[in-house]
Every structure is written in structure tokens, then in C-alpha cells.
Amino acid sequence: MLKIFEKVFGSKHDKDIKKIKPLVDEINEIYATFASLSDDQLRAKSMALKSNLQEELTLIRQQNSDLSGKLENPDITISQIESINRELDELEKKYEEETAAALEKILPETFAIVKDTCRRLKGHTYQVMDHTMTWDMIPYDVQLLGGIVLHQGKVTEMATGEGKTLVSTLPAFLNALTGRGVHIVTVNDYLAQRDREWMSPVFEFHGIETGVILSGMRPEERKKEYACDITYGTNNEFGFDYLRDNMAGSPADLVQKEYYYGIVDEVDSVLIDEARTPLIISGPVPNANTSKFTEIKPWMERLVKNQQNLVAGYLAEAEKVVKEKPNDFQAALALLRAKRGQPKNTRLIKMLSQTGMAKLMQSAENEYLKDNSRRMHEVDDELYFSIDEKSNAIDLTDKGRDFLSKLSNQDSDLFLVPDVGAEIAAIESDEALDTEQKIKKKDEVYRLFSDRSEKLHNISQLLKAYSLFEKDDDYVVQNGQVMIVDEFTGRILPGRRYSDGLHQAIEAKENVKIEGETQTLATITIQNFFRLYKKLSGMTGTAETESAELFDIYKLDVVVIPTNRPIIRKDQDDYVYKTRKEKYAAIIGKIIELQKKGQPVLVGTASVDVSETLSRMLRAKKITHNVLNAKQHGREAEIVASAGQNGAVTIATNMAGRGTDIKLGEGVKELGGLYILGSERHESRRIDRQLRGRSGRQGDPGESIFYVSLEDNLMRLFGSDRVISIMDKLGHEEGDVIEHSMVTKSIERAQKKVEEQNFSIRKRLLEYDDVLNQQRDVIYKRRKGALTKKRLTADIFDLLHDYSENTVNQYAREFDVKGLEEQVLRDLSVEFRIESITFENEGVEKTAEQLYKAALEFYKRKEDVVPEEIMGQIEKYAVLNVIDQKWREHLREIDSLKEGINLRAYGQKDPLLEYKQEAYKLFVSMLGEIEHETLSLAFKLFPVTEEAREKIEQEQKKSQVQQDRLVARHEKAETAYENSGSRPEGRQEKKAENGKEPLQQPVIADKTPGRNDPCSCGSGKKYKNCCGK
């Protein structure tokens, strides 16, 4: 139906292109007039455009500056601050509107200038990544279309080889004229540096500065690169610098400018594939115990071994029963138990490829899945643990729990976690216990709860490590380290680690060194980071299939740009085989056929293991070939460059080499161009389209096909039932192949199912992070305000006003004068005296006013004796130190909340709603603590003596050592909020390059006791159980 409408009314993309085509004509008309200009005259035109643009926006910038200056006034009132902030918000909105209108006006002339600059550069030789390059690019009309779409804040889909890198120069140049900075985001450091060096002649011609952010750069280098008009870098580097800027100790430590305009190259990879992976800066957990996994590991190995024996028995039973009674339900049940116990068992997969077996097992599964899987426990109870491969979940059964409890010897109640609330209530109500005994008993309950919970968590993670994660598929082991393999590119992700102890569990499994645990100090998801940009756009060769998600999450429209020359690549229907063995044999046969012909072939694989299997088979046939996977990524550029030569055979995991075009060698066009052979379908149609897109660039000939088997993961989990049925009916023999458009469509439907599932996970992740994002926004704004102001006196006095009212209210019910006086002395070190009768007569309001005045006088006296610059430092230290400490604690509490929130679903409660409510309570509580402790610190801090200064310097050295141990991670968290809970984590990409001296810590005049210290009032109780309540 949709296609009929498109034929009548035209497609959305046709309409999009039709709207902007007149702009292209205008650009070309202006471009034609520039031919007679000298280089200096052309430069003068770009300078004039920049100057005029800046002049148009000067007035509004000045208004903004004047208003911001008023906020520095120490005597400003809260109502005045709120009024000024409202005006600033209105001004910012107006500024963005005027900037957009001004850029729209100069777009045709600016694009014409860039196009003419490219023409003038033709034949210019220069160095790119130590290779000599000759400029030979002038934007085509379709590239101008792409540039306009990017400037409009949309995603442009352009086929491979259409020159997306050149397209980005057009909107980057235009938006750089604002002086607000443009960020061009790429997928790795190599492409960031290459693209910057490759495109720099266009910008340098007009004096526009370009920079690049690379991992390993020091803060001062980063600051210099960000100061450029255009900065290239990866999403990780931009994101981590944002987080580090929000941990900075002084304005001089900030490296980034504003987030004005971002252009994301390979936008689907960055905004979709990476979207399940939050950016995290973490620090080490003190006294972390890494031996806990080695204690449990022998138990787990025995459990897994017993399960394997159990599954082998069920398979033997199924074989035996089927021989006697082909359709017996007992055989079907045995097969189902084998599948639930070890779904990737080689013998099971082979049996299911036999005629009728998969259908037999499916009949049993359908029976037990009825009524929301109500009877599935009957299947699972006979196993030690069950695996649901589709949802990546694993569940220990009662049989498994009993087995592990026996192995633990001393702990027969291993799986009984105490109900802390009930236990504590019982202790509190036990009148036979004195205070000390109660404290001791409570500590025992907490310790038992903590020990049991941790042990159960470690058992769960080790079970996943042994049953769900496979070496050379999900990860590789290199140089004694477990390294995650990117499922989309096949590349190793250096330093990226799984979270919640899963990575340590895999390290224990593989007998390598178990690294220490870390705790989150700052975090943001990719989605919420890129939402910071005032304007965002992106480009890729494959975005149309993800257009709904790009619009839903980022409000990015997708526009498909027509190719400069028609694509003539032949995309064949899939070849479907019953077993992997048959499929691999067919692939090798096809490669030999193509090599004899001289036609280059690129074989795409989904894992390191498959690429090495095919490589072994080719070596056995003495076929010369190259392998590009996570283990052999060092020669990537060289291998990709030679993949289009006559007779070349290249095996590459997924899209390794993406971002580099494969150019055809001499005579290859006549042979049919590059032949793409996919060894299996990926979960995402987009990844398959990317693989096909390696061939047929710029109108070159080419061919693509996928070889699929019913044993492939995608087919096994989501798509094989109908295809198996067809094969069984046709009586297919070994080696036979199905090739039909209906089968290809069936496979694409299976892919769509997985895509929808992954989208829901990413959307759920965003819904959870949106809660934290609003809180992060409040905290970071407050922190940045404190960081950039010279004095924070007005903020301190505002806190004092609220404190006075709240504290007086607290003691007003019983007119507890002594309690009030002691509280003020503890909190502010202020001697506040008031008679009991006065307290009663004056009431709350007047008493609060007296308290405010007394504290104010104390603070003013302090200002009289402490130099203004030092007072500014004291206030800033108080605010920043407390915010950072409390935010870290809050993140830890939020992590704990996330871990157990899904269990609320068992109580018929929506986990997300519960999470929002709990997170809000935690946030409100944290804000109260921040305000109270900030005020307390500001009053108690005084300049240091010389003796104390030496002590502080020693502490600073310790602090710097801890700072250097911070790591930036890009957490791999696709199941972070799912019941499966494996939360594959994150990226310990590099040390955090803060490189900053910590703020000088003044001496605290009156130290509040620690929560477990004896209370200073002399009661003999701990502080937390007495005055610290």
C-alpha cells in the first residue's frame, strides 16, 4: 500500500531533495562567478562573511555579558538572581534563532566559496598520516545536497564512496564562522586524525583552525585543540572530556567550550550501536577483594561439568526414543531440556538439523510456553540451571542451589539471605539487650546480609561467564588480559570491561590476573551527551532502517541522498544450508571459483572464531588470503587497501575496515568488481547493508550474497522454523541449498524482531538515565556556577537563611534552647545565645532572624580578617568539595538502586516508576546534605598555618596518586536494566587525564566526629546513634 502511495505522491526522500534542490542551483550560480577572483579576493569574501556575522550577533552577546556580570554582585537577592536567569534564558533562545537565520542567509555563498576552494586546491600535494596525497576533489551536486541536509540538523544517508568526509567540510566551514566551535565526531582515533589532516587544506586556505582530540593527550593539549574553530575526535573523547570538565577544580582546568554544533560520522554506529554503552569515569574501590571468585570457581566448574553430563544423557535418551517412536513426546521433552541446559551444545545443534527434529522439539516448547510459561519450571527443575538464550538470561534451579550448598560445606544456608528489616526490628524490640549488644547484633545482621548477597552475586556472575560468554566470540585473551570484541565491527575494544564483577568472573574462568573493582565517579549515556548540542547532524551509508529510532531519541530526520552515479551492484538472494559444515564447504568452493577467475572476494564473518575456521580451511586448500579480525588488526589499513586487487581473498569480521574505501585494481571491473560473501546474517539489517556497501562504490560493478545455515545464531533463535519446515517437506539432502526471495524475506523478518528488541533495550536505558540526567543537569549547573564565580557570598547567605529557619523550627516544638545552641555551635562554630523565655515569646520567625544576624556577624568578622581572595577560595572549596563528595555517594546509591529495582516487578509494581520515586527521594536527600555541609564548611574553614600547610601538601600528593588511578570507561551495558542483569560493562579506556593540582585544602577549625566515633556529648554512644542522628 505504501509503495502505491509513493508512486502517486512521491516518497518522503524525493520531497526532501526537491525542497533543497533550488539552493544547490543558487550555490552553483554563485560558484561560477568566483572563477575570475584571485586567491586573496576569495579569502576576503570568507573573512567578510565572518565579520558581518559576528557584527550581527554583537548586540545580543553584549546584553548576555552585562546580565551575567550582575550575577557576580555579592549583595544580589535571590529574586533578582531568578529574574536575571529568566532573562538570560530568553536571550539564549533569541541568540540561537538569530544565529540560525544569519547562517541560512549566507549558506549559498559560503558553500560556493568552499566549492571554489576545492577547485583551486586541485593538484595540491600534502601529507596525510605520513602518506603523500594529491587533492582531486570538487563537491558534486549530490554532495552539496548532503552538506545542506547536515547544516539543517538532519542525518544524511549517502552510499559508500560518495565522499561523506568532503561533505562534512561544507556545514563545518559555515558554522565555524560563528566562532562557537564545531565538533566532528568519528568512530576511532585513526579516522579523526586522518580526516582532520585530509580536509585541513580547505580550512587552512581561509585561516580556519582545525584541531584533533586523541586518547592520551594531556589537558593542556586538549584545551588548545578545543580552542580551534573545528575539532575532530571520537565520541568517547568528547564525552569523557565533558565528564572531566565537570570534575574540574578551577576554571583554568576546563578544556571544552560550548556544545554548539556536532557532526557525527558513521552516525548509526555512534548513536545506535554505542548507545547501550554509558560513558563512565571511575576510581578504584579501596580494599577490594579479588580472591572471592577463586574460592567459588571450583564449585562452578563442577556444576557446569555435571550439567554437561546431564545434557549428554538427555540427548542420548532423545536419540534412543526417536529411533523407536519418531514423534514421541518424551524425545521432544529430552531435546527441550538439552536446549534449556546447554543451547550451544554441538551434538544438540546437529540433531536439530536432522529432518523433523527441530519441529519435534518446538512442539514440546510450545506446550510448556503456554499461559506465560507457567509450566516451564517442570522442564527446568531437572537441570542444575536453565538458560534462556533469546533474553541472555540464566537461572539457577533448586537442584543447582542444593548442589552448591553441599559444596560450600560450612554454609548450608548459602542461599538464605536475611530479611534485614525484620531482623533489625526484632533486635530493636528485644528488651533483654542493652544498647551495645543491640549495636553488635545489628552489625552481625548487616555483615551476614552483605557476605551472603556478595557470594550469591559472584556465583551468578561466574555462572554467566561459564555459560553465556564464549572465548574468541564475545572476547579474546591476549597478553594475559580478557579483551572484549565489538560485536558490530569485530575490533578489540581496548580496556573496555564488563560490569558488576562479570569481567572478573571471566578473568577467573580464563586463569588470568583478576583486576580490582571500580566505583563510578561520573557517568552519562551517549544519548544524553549528544543531546547537549544545540544542533546535531550525522552522516552514514546505512541509516534508513534506523530512522524511527534516530527521530524518536534524538529528533533527527533521515534524508537519503541520491548517488552521483547509479549503483549497479547485484545483490543476490541468500543461500540457505542446513548445517554450518555444508555452508562452510560451499563458501570455500565459491572462493576457489572466484580466485581462479581473478575476481577479488571479501568474506564477512560475525566472529573471530568463524574467520579463523574459514582461514584454516583455505590454508588446507593452499589458498592465499588475508584475515582481518580482533587478533590481527595491526595491518588493517594495508589489508583493506589490497582487498580490491586481482585475485585477492580477504576474510574480515563484520565491518572491520569501515571508513576506508576498497578501490578496485586494474582489470577488476571487467571481472565483475568486488564480490561480497557474507558468511552469516547479522542481528541488524544495517550491518548487512554496510557489508554489501563495500562493493559497487561510485558506479563500480560488484556482487553480494549471504550464505546462511540453520545452525547460525540468528536462524536458531529467531528465524528457522518456517525455513526448516520447507526444507523438511522438500526432502533436502546434505549439501543442498535453498535460494528464494521468500526465504530472504523470512530472514529479514527475524532480523527485524531482534532490532525491535534491541531498540526497546536502548529506549529503556534512556528512560532510566533520563531520571539521572535531570539530576546531573542540576548538579553540574550548580557546580559550574560555583567554579566560574569569583565569590559565592550571596549563595552562602542564602543557605544560611534557609538553615536558620529550618534549625529553629526543629527545636521550636519543645523550645529546646540548649539543643538549638549546641546544634548551631556544632554546625557553624557560632556561639548563639538566647533565653528560653525569649525563644517562646519571640516565636520561630524572629528567633530565626536573630540566628541569621548572629551567624552573619560571625561571617563578616571572618571576612574582615581573611583577605578577599582567600575567602573566595574557601567558599569555592566548600561548595565544590561537598558537591563532588555527595554526587559520588549519590551515584553509588543509584547503582545499588538499579541492581535490585527489577525485582519490584514480582510485586506487580512498575520498576521504572519505582526507580523514579526512589531516585527522587535520594536526590532530595542529597541536596539537603549538600546545602547543610557546604554551609558548615564555609563557616568552619580558615587559612592554614605553615605547619599545617606541609601536612596538607603530603595529603595532596596522596590525592594526586588517587586521581591518576581514575579511569575512563565506555561501559558495555546493553542489558543494564533487564532482568537478565548481566550488564556487560565498560571501557577502562585510559587513565583520566585530569593532570590538575587538587584545590588547596584549608584546615577545618572544628572537626565533626566520624559516624562510628564516640559522641562528644559524653553519652558513651556512637556519634551516628546519638547527636549525629
Swiss-Prot record:
<dbReference type="InterPro" id="IPR014018">
    <property type="entry name" value="SecA_motor_DEAD"/>
</dbReference>
<dbReference type="InterPro" id="IPR000185">
    <property type="entry name" value="SecA"/>
</dbReference>
<dbReference type="GO" id="GO:0005524">
    <property type="term" value="F:ATP binding"/>
</dbReference>
<keyword id="KW-0963">Cytoplasm</keyword>
<dbReference type="Pfam" id="PF01043">
    <property type="entry name" value="SecA_PP_bind"/>
</dbReference>
<comment type="function">
    <text>Part of the Sec protein translocase complex. Interacts with the SecYEG preprotein conducting channel. Has a central role in coupling the hydrolysis of ATP to the transfer of proteins into and across the cell membrane, serving as an ATP-driven molecular motor driving the stepwise translocation of polypeptide chains across the membrane.</text>
</comment>
<keyword id="KW-1003">Cell membrane</keyword>
<feature type="binding site">
    <location>
        <position position="1026"/>
    </location>
    <ligand>
        <name>Zn(2+)</name>
    </ligand>
</feature>
<keyword id="KW-0472">Membrane</keyword>
<keyword id="KW-0067">ATP-binding</keyword>
<dbReference type="InterPro" id="IPR011115">
    <property type="entry name" value="SecA_DEAD"/>
</dbReference>
<dbReference type="InterPro" id="IPR036266">
    <property type="entry name" value="SecA_Wing/Scaffold_sf"/>
</dbReference>
<dbReference type="Pfam" id="PF21090">
    <property type="entry name" value="P-loop_SecA"/>
</dbReference>
<keyword id="KW-0997">Cell inner membrane</keyword>
<feature type="compositionally biased region" description="Basic and acidic residues">
    <location>
        <begin position="966"/>
        <end position="975"/>
    </location>
</feature>
<feature type="binding site">
    <location>
        <begin position="161"/>
        <end position="165"/>
    </location>
    <ligand>
        <name>ATP</name>
    </ligand>
</feature>
<dbReference type="Pfam" id="PF07517">
    <property type="entry name" value="SecA_DEAD"/>
</dbReference>
<keyword id="KW-0862">Zinc</keyword>
<keyword id="KW-0547">Nucleotide-binding</keyword>
<dbReference type="GO" id="GO:0031522">
    <property type="term" value="C:cell envelope Sec protein transport complex"/>
</dbReference>
<comment type="subunit">
    <text>Monomer and homodimer. Part of the essential Sec protein translocation apparatus which comprises SecA, SecYEG and auxiliary proteins SecDF. Other proteins may also be involved.</text>
</comment>
<feature type="binding site">
    <location>
        <position position="661"/>
    </location>
    <ligand>
        <name>ATP</name>
    </ligand>
</feature>
<dbReference type="InterPro" id="IPR014001">
    <property type="entry name" value="Helicase_ATP-bd"/>
</dbReference>
<dbReference type="GO" id="GO:0006605">
    <property type="term" value="P:protein targeting"/>
</dbReference>
<feature type="region of interest" description="Disordered">
    <location>
        <begin position="953"/>
        <end position="1029"/>
    </location>
</feature>
<dbReference type="GO" id="GO:0046872">
    <property type="term" value="F:metal ion binding"/>
</dbReference>
<feature type="compositionally biased region" description="Basic and acidic residues">
    <location>
        <begin position="984"/>
        <end position="996"/>
    </location>
</feature>
<feature type="binding site">
    <location>
        <position position="1017"/>
    </location>
    <ligand>
        <name>Zn(2+)</name>
    </ligand>
</feature>
<dbReference type="GO" id="GO:0005886">
    <property type="term" value="C:plasma membrane"/>
</dbReference>
<protein>
    <recommendedName>
        <fullName>Protein translocase subunit SecA</fullName>
        <ecNumber>7.4.2.8</ecNumber>
    </recommendedName>
</protein>
<dbReference type="GO" id="GO:0005829">
    <property type="term" value="C:cytosol"/>
</dbReference>
<dbReference type="GO" id="GO:0043952">
    <property type="term" value="P:protein transport by the Sec complex"/>
</dbReference>
<comment type="similarity">
    <text>Belongs to the SecA family.</text>
</comment>
<dbReference type="InterPro" id="IPR011116">
    <property type="entry name" value="SecA_Wing/Scaffold"/>
</dbReference>
<feature type="binding site">
    <location>
        <position position="143"/>
    </location>
    <ligand>
        <name>ATP</name>
    </ligand>
</feature>
<keyword id="KW-0653">Protein transport</keyword>
<dbReference type="InterPro" id="IPR020937">
    <property type="entry name" value="SecA_CS"/>
</dbReference>
<feature type="binding site">
    <location>
        <position position="1027"/>
    </location>
    <ligand>
        <name>Zn(2+)</name>
    </ligand>
</feature>
<dbReference type="InterPro" id="IPR044722">
    <property type="entry name" value="SecA_SF2_C"/>
</dbReference>
<keyword id="KW-0479">Metal-binding</keyword>
<keyword id="KW-1278">Translocase</keyword>
<dbReference type="InterPro" id="IPR027417">
    <property type="entry name" value="P-loop_NTPase"/>
</dbReference>
